[in-house]
């Protein structure tokens, strides 16, 4: 044929229309209550784990984030997988040789919960450089869901972001960029052990405040001023405003440290590695779009 047909259609994920009934106060109250039932222990490194160190968790968490990004998983998959990881480590001692297997299993289950086409066991084994087998992953999956008592629909910070945005008088184009930046902060927080003690609602609220601050939106909208937005969100999630400010400042400090180490690594990889060894929590890797945030 002289003229070939050119198909320009792009496959898009089919999503349900937004339902305002799912964003009302009754649902938010239920979510705030539900997040308490899926909280990990904040002291599992001292009380439960004998071989696993925070730095090891950081390495596995960064690897999990990279896998989720490369596979273009839904934003909720990685935080949900980290919730499973933290809760399992709160209950069961794990040998360091099996930590990557646990991380892969957590992604495997989380993708089943959030993806229309979940990650396969074979694909996850490839990402471990075939250090684990599919049958090992399936066995660990059974152990994981039993230890978690099949309570797999855990609340994550992403569940709260939409509630906050729906209550904020902000233009839709600004909501989209706030959402994207807040999601990036959530992913960054999930890799750091210091945020295990913060409930998902507080991480979400702190991420939204940090996103608004970084985008300098408070100058054009008085509602988005730092103190007013912090007071508003603290009332929404029923927490002390000072606690929310502390969480938001911790997020910004984590971002700055992550950016600084990423820049050092690009200029002097050896010096960056030495600095990582000095810190218990390795913050060298940054999630997508973090470098676009200005604070």
UniProtKB/Swiss-Prot annotation:
Compartment(s) of residence: Nucleus; Cytoplasm; Nucleus membrane
Domain spans labelled Cyclin N-terminal: 28-152
Signal peptide extent: none
InterPro entries found in the cross-reference section: Cyclin (IPR039361), Cyclin-like_dom (IPR013763), Cyclin-like_sf (IPR036915), Cyclin_C-dom (IPR004367), Cyclin_N (IPR006671)
Region (Disordered): 264-295
Bias (Acidic residues) ranges: 273-282
Gene3D superfamilies for this protein: Cyclin-like
GO biological process terms, semicolon-separated: cell division; DNA damage response; G1/S transition of mitotic cell cycle; mitotic G1 DNA damage checkpoint signaling; negative regulation of transcription by RNA polymerase II; positive regulation of G1/S transition of mitotic cell cycle; positive regulation of G2/M transition of mitotic cell cycle; response to UV-A
Key word Cell division present: yes
GO molecular function: cyclin-dependent protein serine/threonine kinase regulator activity; protein serine/threonine kinase activator activity; transcription corepressor activity
Highest taxon, organism lineage: Eukaryota
SUPFAM superfamilies for the chain: Cyclin-like
PTM notes: Phosphorylation at Thr-286 by MAP kinases is required for ubiquitination and degradation by the DCX(AMBRA1) complex. It also plays an essential role for recognition by the FBXO31 component of SCF (SKP1-cullin-F-box) protein ligase complex following DNA damage. Ubiquitinated at Lys-270 by the DCX(AMBRA1) complex during the transition from G1 to S cell phase, leading to its degradation: ubiquitination is dependent on Thr-286 phosphorylation. The DCX(AMBRA1) complex represents the major regulator of CCND1 stability during the G1/S transition. Also ubiquitinated by the SCF(FBXO4) and Cul7-RING(FBXW8) ubiquitin-protein ligase complexes. Following DNA damage it is ubiquitinated by the SCF(FBXO31) protein ligase complex. SCF(FBXO31) ubiquitination is dependent on Thr-286 phosphorylation.
The entry's keywords: Cell cycle, Cell division, Cyclin, Cytoplasm, Isopeptide bond, Membrane, Nucleus, Phosphoprotein, Repressor, Transcription, Transcription regulation, Ubl conjugation
Similarity field: Belongs to the cyclin family. Cyclin D subfamily.
Cited function: Regulatory component of the cyclin D1-CDK4 (DC) complex that phosphorylates and inhibits members of the retinoblastoma (RB) protein family including RB1 and regulates the cell-cycle during G(1)/S transition. Phosphorylation of RB1 allows dissociation of the transcription factor E2F from the RB/E2F complex and the subsequent transcription of E2F target genes which are responsible for the progression through the G(1) phase. Hypophosphorylates RB1 in early G(1) phase. Cyclin D-CDK4 complexes are major integrators of various mitogenenic and antimitogenic signals.
Oligomer and partners: Interacts with either CDK4 or CDK6 protein kinase to form a serine/threonine kinase holoenzyme complex. The cyclin subunit imparts substrate specificity to the complex. Component of the ternary complex CCND1/CDK4/CDKN1B required for nuclear translocation and modulation of CDK4-mediated kinase activity. Interacts directly with CDKN1B. Can form similar complexes with either CDKN1A or CDKN2A. Interacts with UHRF2; the interaction ubiquitinates CCND1 and appears to occur independently of phosphorylation. Interacts with USP2.
Protein name: G1/S-specific cyclin-D1
Organism: Canis lupus familiaris
